[in-house]
């Protein structure tokens, strides 16, 4: 593995996953995220009691929203230092060869991603109680699929079925969903 890609993946995980999961499941922000934000003068102002509130504010049930995977690689070009600070300063999007796509929205369809999320929660966050709060497939101009007064949405049935298969796999491996 390319070390620069591994670093980009780590930063994306910090920004898009751990910045939300760690406070509500561990009671603190990841130290490496805090250091990164501080080094770019992006750390929000906090009061001394904020740390206590975060530590005590753990949740009982986690809602998971999953539509598509986020795949990243190291940046191919330098960042414009005059541009606003964004997570994308640290990585570029990566397009997996042979990926399955939702042609109506341009999103990758990767049903095993729901399983990956559950395994991460089980192995790295103490297997919290969770549920899938959002998952689905957006399609533009669905009226074009109307046949005899009914929408032929086999594409959506297949999407949900594939995701439920991977959800079931996670549950069968003792994920608490």
Q: PLM features: residue spans?
A:
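Active-site region of glycoside hydrolase catalytic domains
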Residues: 1-177
